[in-house]
């Protein structure tokens, strides 16, 4: 039996880490064997690529180089962790996936969506998440939350206009795949956010 693939998406400061833990706990309470992972990352090599991708540096990072690092990490992650787990019948819960690439590198950086689509097919074929929980929030509120943390990565230091484009990119993805996307208002109190997430997951199950 093939497992199910759940992804959690959103811009900075939406509370992904907290809500990923909530989703994992909810699934385990239903006796579901779930692996929680993240992108970029999830395997030793993919985590090394993540560090390269997020590190602040004096040298400007070319947008195309950024895109290729994302997909290099994804190829390793999919082939070494995600696909084998799904084949064993385990569920995979992933912090970000290809929707983030369309949002950040496509809408945010202005790279060709056609190019991203070609790389997507090369790396993952027809594999798509079964459900995507999109934690959506006003960009300024999200950045205020994110920047309350001391150590910001290269992406978290981008300006508001970048994240407005990213949010619009997520909105476009949700409009293209409404059956897969579940938008959650992440600007609400946490208890309400998690009530909404649980309701969406119960409908999915």
UniProtKB/Swiss-Prot annotation:
GO biological process, one term: dTTP biosynthetic process
GO molecular function annotation: ATP binding; dTMP kinase activity
Pfam families noted in UniProt: Thymidylate_kin (PF02223)
Keyword terms of this UniProt record: ATP-binding, Kinase, Nucleotide biosynthesis, Nucleotide-binding, Transferase
Reaction it catalyzes: dTMP + ATP = dTDP + ADP
Entry keyword Secreted: no
Family: Belongs to the thymidylate kinase family.
Protein name: Thymidylate kinase
Species the sequence originates in: Teredinibacter turnerae (strain ATCC 39867 / T7901)
Lineage: Bacteria, Pseudomonadati, Pseudomonadota, Gammaproteobacteria, Cellvibrionales
């Amino acid at each position: 039996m093939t497992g199910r693939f759940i992804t959690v998406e959103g811009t900075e400061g939406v509370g992904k880490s907290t809500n990923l833990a909530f989703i994992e706990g909810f699934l385990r309470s239903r006796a579901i064997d779930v692996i929680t992972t993240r992108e970029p990352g999830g395997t030793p090599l993919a985590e090394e690529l993540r560090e390269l991708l997020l590190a602040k540096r004096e040298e400007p990072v070319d947008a195309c180089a950024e895109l290729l690092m994302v997909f290099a990490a994804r190829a390793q992650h999919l082939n070494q962790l995600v696909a084998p787990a799904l084949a064993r019948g385990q569920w995979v819960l992933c912090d970000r996936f290809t929707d983030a690439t369309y949002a950040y590198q496509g809408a945010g950086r202005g790279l060709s969506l056609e190019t991203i689509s070609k790389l997507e097919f090369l790396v993952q074929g027809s594999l798509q998440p079964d459900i995507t929980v999109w934690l959506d929030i006003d960009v300024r509120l999200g950045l205020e939350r994110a920047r309350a943390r001391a150590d910001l990565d290269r992406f978290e230091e981008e300006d508001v206009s970048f994240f407005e484009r990213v949010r619009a990119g997520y909105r476009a993805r949700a409009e293209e795949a409404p059956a897969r996307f579940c938008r959650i208002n992440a600007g609400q109190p946490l208890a309400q956010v998690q009530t909404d997430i649980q309701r969406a997951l119960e409908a999915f199950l």
